[in-house]
């Protein structure tokens, strides 16, 4: 239904540019495309009578605003089943003790259906209109995830995980099996016939794939012009193992396989070296910043400002279940926290060991509007889908959240636009996200 929303509208246009319209409007056509946005609805309607005719008006309250939907650039869908568990050990131990045994269960179709229905429901409830999902090694259950995203109306990139080495015997495949299943998955997703759900090539991480498998996956991505997702430089032990096996840097291992493209998003990037950052920029790759899991699994503090200034696109990832929440809003807060912690290290030298090479008195903390960019347009750009979604530019799909800051505790006074956004970011939850839209279709209505 063609609709015009009348009230406060906010979005970002770049990492440093936040735009808002108090008492503004946003118009959406029957196809779910944004056809008008700005301050003066009546002036727009007068100059666009054909578009304005027949629009249903929706009036927002003083405590409501429209914003773009959240983008989760990195989430492990099967690990939703162990959310909040096993976060007392570092990455490699956590994988072997908790995660690999869990993911092996997804050979059971009924179990996979139950979990995947739950994770799509939960992420949509929290305002995630676009997610980049890792599934498991299993072809059929990964197709189940794709079908579930289509059924519930979520925009998604979905990958069948590939791993043929350095994995437990009960959860490993041969390179031939991995390539065959990946090709079958790509074809299976395309047969679903939905432009909302797309396949993405997914080597789990460099350690879990042989050089031959990585190269084969790079070839498939090139042949079909596919998205690519994996992990990079999350944990110091992991990095040293990669260097020992591949005799190059972590980024170099992927680059030699043809896996670094302008459709590649790599999770974490906590310990990237300067030449790796430069390589990612040249290749047009992006990083999914996962501050929650980087903290939970004791991986480190990722310097987002360094990546952005180095020309690398950055989005946010929940990294469920290394991260303990499916909410990108929660991750947004954690990103701000990590930036403050880095500020402590760089300016206050709290290590107590004299001048540290990490010291930087010119470091600038992330601001909440910059973090909002990372959670929306930055994420869409990181996933190479910013031509479709991420903000309210004309012609894009209407992927949006209707936020109401008065749902739980009504403010004692009227708030400015900036205050509305800031209050939601710092004190809000999924309860404040009263409506969710994907491609113009209402997915959630009312507090659930």
Curated annotation (Swiss-Prot):
<dbReference type="GO" id="GO:0006147">
    <property type="term" value="P:guanine catabolic process"/>
</dbReference>
<dbReference type="GO" id="GO:0008892">
    <property type="term" value="F:guanine deaminase activity"/>
</dbReference>
<feature type="binding site">
    <location>
        <position position="76"/>
    </location>
    <ligand>
        <name>Zn(2+)</name>
    </ligand>
</feature>
<dbReference type="GO" id="GO:0004153">
    <property type="term" value="F:dihydropterin deaminase activity"/>
</dbReference>
<dbReference type="GO" id="GO:0006726">
    <property type="term" value="P:eye pigment biosynthetic process"/>
</dbReference>
<dbReference type="GO" id="GO:0051067">
    <property type="term" value="P:dihydropteridine metabolic process"/>
</dbReference>
<comment type="similarity">
    <text>Belongs to the metallo-dependent hydrolases superfamily. ATZ/TRZ family.</text>
</comment>
<comment type="function">
    <text>Catalyzes the hydrolytic deamination of guanine, producing xanthine and ammonia. Also has 7,8-dihydropterin deaminase activity, which plays a role in synthesis of the red eye pigment aurodrosopterin.</text>
</comment>
<dbReference type="GO" id="GO:0005829">
    <property type="term" value="C:cytosol"/>
</dbReference>
<keyword id="KW-0378">Hydrolase</keyword>
<dbReference type="InterPro" id="IPR051607">
    <property type="entry name" value="Metallo-dep_hydrolases"/>
</dbReference>
<protein>
    <recommendedName>
        <fullName>Guanine deaminase</fullName>
        <ecNumber>3.5.4.3</ecNumber>
        <ecNumber>3.5.4.-</ecNumber>
    </recommendedName>
</protein>
<dbReference type="InterPro" id="IPR011059">
    <property type="entry name" value="Metal-dep_hydrolase_composite"/>
</dbReference>
<dbReference type="GO" id="GO:0046098">
    <property type="term" value="P:guanine metabolic process"/>
</dbReference>
<feature type="binding site">
    <location>
        <begin position="204"/>
        <end position="205"/>
    </location>
    <ligand>
        <name>substrate</name>
    </ligand>
</feature>
<feature type="binding site">
    <location>
        <begin position="231"/>
        <end position="234"/>
    </location>
    <ligand>
        <name>substrate</name>
    </ligand>
</feature>
<dbReference type="GO" id="GO:0008270">
    <property type="term" value="F:zinc ion binding"/>
</dbReference>
<keyword id="KW-0862">Zinc</keyword>
<dbReference type="InterPro" id="IPR014311">
    <property type="entry name" value="Guanine_deaminase"/>
</dbReference>
<dbReference type="Pfam" id="PF01979">
    <property type="entry name" value="Amidohydro_1"/>
</dbReference>
<keyword id="KW-0479">Metal-binding</keyword>
<feature type="binding site">
    <location>
        <position position="319"/>
    </location>
    <ligand>
        <name>substrate</name>
    </ligand>
</feature>
<feature type="binding site">
    <location>
        <position position="74"/>
    </location>
    <ligand>
        <name>Zn(2+)</name>
    </ligand>
</feature>
<feature type="binding site">
    <location>
        <begin position="76"/>
        <end position="79"/>
    </location>
    <ligand>
        <name>substrate</name>
    </ligand>
</feature>
<dbReference type="InterPro" id="IPR032466">
    <property type="entry name" value="Metal_Hydrolase"/>
</dbReference>
<feature type="binding site">
    <location>
        <position position="319"/>
    </location>
    <ligand>
        <name>Zn(2+)</name>
    </ligand>
</feature>
<feature type="binding site">
    <location>
        <position position="231"/>
    </location>
    <ligand>
        <name>Zn(2+)</name>
    </ligand>
</feature>
<comment type="pathway">
    <text>Purine metabolism; guanine degradation; xanthine from guanine: step 1/1.</text>
</comment>
<dbReference type="InterPro" id="IPR006680">
    <property type="entry name" value="Amidohydro-rel"/>
</dbReference>
